Amino acid sequence: MASLLSLSSTPPSTANSNNYPSSTFKGNINNFRINPFNFAPLKLHLRNIVKKESTRLVVVASASSSNVSPSIGSGSETRFRLDNLGPQPGSRKKGKRKGRGHAAGQGGSCGFGMRGQKSRSGPGIMRGFEGGQMPLYRRIPKLRGIAGGMRAGLPKYVPINLRDIEVAGFKEGEEVSLESLKAKGIINPSGRERRLPLKILGEGELSTKLQIKARAFSGSAKEKLEAAGCSVTVLPGRKKYIKESVRKNLARADEYFAKKRAASASEAESA
């Protein structure tokens, strides 16, 4: 023990003194034996490795061009890629992690304040709550339908534009229908769309006179087809299922109004 802790006038070497923390010990530090089982924490070791290997990227924005250069002092050039994107230091602030109790270092209230609704237990205040007054989302006027946020719903037609019909290469006088478009490979409906009818839209121009049959036409498409001399045929829709009792009532109503029209016509002739 005396040999280990013997005082010496020789100053400690700077090379070995860097490996030990500063202390008030005045002896010869070279006599200490290094403990081979004294390892640094794994988390600290990994953090040092990441600091050595990582290079911070600085995006230099200019009016003419944008350059990406590594930070000052880094020897290796690192490319600016999607896998090394990240926010600038200090641009994103971490939320305050509120503890529980005095040991958290935030006092007895733990960062929630003294009293009030926000300091109590539970989920807190619901989103949009304004203290009891009429909230903003209920004060604004209501919009119905798609403008108010409702879904547009499932598609009701298989749409096709005039430019697609022009590219298909139909000859003059040929018939354009859902079957002919399928045969030419212009449309290939699958799943639920196989039972949907055809609708013609007006994007593009058509220079050939054709016989077009579809369930529906947009306004611009109908105008362009009539201007080009095409024949437009609106196909009837699928018959809606009606109960037998409702069908009898409708037939009775049609019969009643037919008699009424005939009576009014006879009165007009006699007058």
UniProtKB/Swiss-Prot annotation:
Q: Where is the composition biased (Low complexity)?
A: 66-76
What PROSITE patterns has UniProt attached to this entry? RIBOSOMAL_L15
* Family annotation (Pfam families): Ribosomal_L27A
Q: Name one GO biological process term.
A: translation
Basic residues bias (residue ranges)? 91-101
Q: Where is the composition biased (Gly residues)?
A: 102-114
Keywords annotated in UniProt? Chloroplast, Plastid, Ribonucleoprotein, Ribosomal protein, Transit peptide
Chain segments carrying region Disordered: 1-21, 66-120
The residues forming the transit peptide are 1-61
Q: What is one GO cellular-component annotation here?
A: chloroplast
Subcellular location per UniProt equals:
Plastid, Chloroplast
Q: One GO molecular-function annotation for this sequence?
A: mRNA binding
Spell out the NCBIfam families in the cross-references. Answer: rplO_bact (TIGR01071)
Assembly description: Component of the chloroplast large ribosomal subunit (LSU). Mature 70S chloroplast ribosomes of higher plants consist of a small (30S) and a large (50S) subunit. The 30S small subunit contains 1 molecule of ribosomal RNA (16S rRNA) and 24 different proteins. The 50S large subunit contains 3 rRNA molecules (23S, 5S and 4.5S rRNA) and 33 different proteins.
Record function comment: Component of the chloroplast ribosome (chloro-ribosome), a dedicated translation machinery responsible for the synthesis of chloroplast genome-encoded proteins, including proteins of the transcription and translation machinery and components of the photosynthetic apparatus.
Q: Which family does it belong to?
A: Belongs to the universal ribosomal protein uL15 family.
State what protein this is by name: Large ribosomal subunit protein uL15c
The lineage, from the top, is: Eukaryota, Viridiplantae, Streptophyta, Embryophyta, Tracheophyta
